[in-house]
Regions:
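ABC ATPase C-loop
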Residues: 48-49
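Hydrophobic anchor residue at the start of the ABC signature
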Residues: 45
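Conserved ABC ATPase signature
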Residues: 31-35, 39
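Conserved ABC ATPase "signature" region
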Residues: 9-27
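Helical segment within the ABC ATPase nucleotide-binding domain
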Residues: 71-83
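Catalytic Walker B motif of ABC-type/P-loop ATPase nucleotide-binding domains
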Residues: 56-59
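Conserved beta-strand-loop-alpha-helix hinge in the C-terminal portion
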Residues: 110-136
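Conserved catalytic motifs of ABC-family nucleotide-binding domains
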Residues: 52
Length: 140
């Protein structure tokens, strides 16, 4: 069966819901030069979520952001993941990786290790410490 066509109004409403969820509805009409890096990243996440994907690829989603904006973007990605969207993310930032439920350490395209022990740890600092210890054990 064919997917039902969504009306322009339905798409508009979903876009506004996503912007509210990401905390950027107030910048919806702003020029791109008038928004912060964190707001722009959240706008990109909104755009990628418009078609309700089951899987989202995020390549360094916090790479060019300050720590505050990075935390905001990661908080939104964690929420999306908790709502059922699988997220495959590339990052070189251990603080960012510590927010993930499963971490693969990849060198030259080869998986050198997999860590899933973060799921049970609720304290953010303890998650970071646990991941850093695992990375040290791998020689990183």
């Amino acid at each position: 069966s064919k997917k039902s066509k969504e009306s322009r109004e339905e798409k508009q409403e979903r876009g506004e819901q996503l912007m509210r969820k990401m905390g950027i509805i107030e910048i919806a009409d702003n020029d791109i030069n008038e928004v912060s890096g964190g707001q722009l990243q959240r706008a990109c996440i909104c755009r990628s979520m418009m078609n309700r994907p089951k899987l989202l690829f995020a390549d360094e989603p916090t790479g060019a952001l300050n720590r505050t904006s990075s935390n905001e973007v990661m908080d939104e990605l964690v929420k999306l993941n908790n709502e059922g969207t699988t997220i495959v993310m590339v990052t070189h930032d251990a603080k960012v990786a510590a927010k993930c439920g499963r971490v693969l350490f990849i060198v030259d395209g080869n998986i050198k290790g997999e860590y899933t022990g973060l799921k049970e740890i609720t304290d953010e600092k303890e998650r970071e410490r646990s991941l850093n210890n695992w990375l040290l054990d791998l020689g990183w």
